Amino acid sequence: MSEVDVVRASEQPFKAVEGDGARGLELARLYRDPENGATFQLARVAPGGVSKRHAHEWVQANWIAGGQAEVDVEGEKFILGSGDSIVIPGGKAHHFRNPGQVPLVLVAVLGPGAP
């Protein structure tokens, strides 16, 4: 038996995340390590959509797979496009916004300790 996990994004359910300032955001968990909680997820943000402003103790690495993102980290803004990445240290308040006309698709890796 192989120890390799294959996860098909097309088979993962997306959950809408609304409230607390979030709108137009959907998340799909692709993998969560059962031992340390590290998580691999896919996010879709509709044009004009935004995630809620939040902070957590684990690092969050993000890769933009498509579209455009405006990322606010502790008040500092970054504009990212397809292929760009940003790593947000634990404890830093942040949120994402899609300023573009097409959906933003990003892949996020949440460090150990993520729920």
Cite the ranges covered by each PLM segment.
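A short, N-terminal "cap"/entry segment at the start of jelly-roll beta-barrel domains
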Residues: 1-38
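Conserved short histidine dyad/triad with adjacent acidic residue
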Residues: 28, 40-56, 90
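Short, conserved beta-strand element in jelly-roll/cupin
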Residues: 44-45, 56-71
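Short acidic-glycine-tyrosine-enriched beta hairpin
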Residues: 75-90
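A short hydrophobic beta-strand segment most commonly corresponding to one strand
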Residues: 87, 101-115
